């Protein structure tokens, strides 16, 4: 007796062939999903602006479509639905009164808030009752408020260190440091924290004195802090050493001059004394006795 899966008649089609045929029919009847795409205008949205979620390449033979808020399509997350043939718009539980759904499938928001950040799903229903979905993540940014700078000290002695911290109440921002109204050129003596909101200078030099600002920004706005003036004092020890070296050099130079002058004076006195002495008589050269008459 043959296996149960064997086909006793020549007209019988193997189950693998039926499965392949069903897969091909399903692929043939299913609407294409490659062109259903949602675009946001503007792409980066600031709090209080209007935003338009448009459907790119909307398929044909549609019966209706609906917009949902959230990662999944749930009845309680329906914003609004639209039936194409009857032009009937039906608001859902997630409708806030600021959304408008158009006959072309677009969703228009007015005066968006931070709470509008999240996923939005478009579900389209074809006339053959098949369903297709597309998702888009909307990010709403808040306008950046003015930050502030806190310094470990505003007057620092040369060769010391200072820590500058930028404070902001906004989240999702980037930090940039400004020195004398220009972007700070970070040197080997400077260290930035992971998010750049803390600047450490060690050791500090006279060239680091000036006005510092921090700038915070997000994709839709930016703001700078008030200037903070940093004063760098000279190192007293270094100044004392320099003064000591200078005074010592002057004393050594004065001593050398004194010794030279003294040596020169002694040589001059000896020369004058020699010139004032009478010449000494030579022995045996006195007056001869024979000359006396």
From Swiss-Prot:
Q: Quick one: signal sequence residues?
A: 1-34
Domain of life of the native organism = Eukaryota
Annotated region (Disordered), positions in chain: 267-293
Q: Which GO terms describe its biological process?
A: immune response; T cell activation
One GO cellular component term of this record is: external side of plasma membrane
The record's annotation in SUPFAM superfamilies points to: Immunoglobulin
The alphabetized UniProt keywords are: Disulfide bond, Glycoprotein, Immunoglobulin domain, Membrane, Signal, Transmembrane, Transmembrane helix
Q: List where the protein spans the membrane.
A: 241-261
Compartments (UniProt record): Membrane
Q: Tell me any Pfam family this protein matches.
A: Ig_3
Q: List the disulfide bonds.
A: 166-214
Domain Ig-like C2-type stretches = 147-231
UniProt topological domain (Cytoplasmic) ranges? 262-293
> What positions does the record give for glycosylation?
111
Per the record, what ranges lie on the membrane's Extracellular side? 35-240
Membrane topology, from the record: Single-pass type I membrane protein
Name the family the entry cites.
Belongs to the immunoglobulin superfamily. CEA family.
| UniProt-recorded name of the protein | Cell adhesion molecule CEACAM21
Instruction: Name its species.
Output: Homo sapiens
């Amino acid at each position: 007796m043959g296996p149960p899966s064997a086909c006793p008649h020549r007209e019988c089609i193997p189950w693998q062939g039926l499965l392949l045929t069903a897969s091909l029919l399903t692929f043939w009847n299913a609407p294409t999903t490659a062109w259903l795409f949602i675009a946001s205008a503007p792409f980066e949205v600031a709090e209080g602006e209007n935003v338009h979620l448009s459907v790119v390449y909307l398929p044909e033979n549609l019966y209706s479509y609906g917009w949902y808020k959230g990662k999944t399509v749930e009845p309680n997350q329906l914003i609004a639905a639209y039936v194409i043939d009857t032009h009937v718009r039906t608001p859902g539980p997630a409708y806030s009164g600021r959304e408008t759904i158009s006959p072309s499938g677009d969703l228009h928001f007015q005066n968006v808030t931070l709470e509008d950040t999240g996923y939005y799903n478009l579900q389209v229903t074809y006339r053959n009752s098949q369903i297709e979905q597309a998702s888009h993540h909307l990010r709403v940014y808040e306008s950046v408020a003015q930050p502030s700078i806190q310094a470990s000290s505003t007057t620092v002695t040369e060769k010391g260190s200072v820590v500058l911290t930028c404070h902001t109440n906004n989240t999702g921002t980037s930090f940039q440091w400004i020195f004398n109204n220009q972007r700070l050129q970070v040197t080997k003596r400077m260290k930035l924290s992971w998010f750049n909101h803390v600047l450490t200078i060690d050791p500090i030099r006279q060239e680091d004195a000036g006005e510092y600002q921090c700038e915070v920004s997000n994709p839709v706005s930016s703001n700078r802090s008030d200037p903070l003036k940093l004063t760098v004092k000279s190192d007293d020890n270094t100044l004392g050493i320099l003064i000591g070296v200078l005074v010592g050099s002057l004393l050594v130079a004065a001593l050398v001059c004194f010794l030279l002058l003294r040596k020169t004076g002694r040589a001059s006195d000896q020369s004058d004394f020699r010139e004032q002495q009478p010449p000494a008589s030579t022995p045996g050269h006195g007056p001869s006795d024979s000359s006396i008459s």
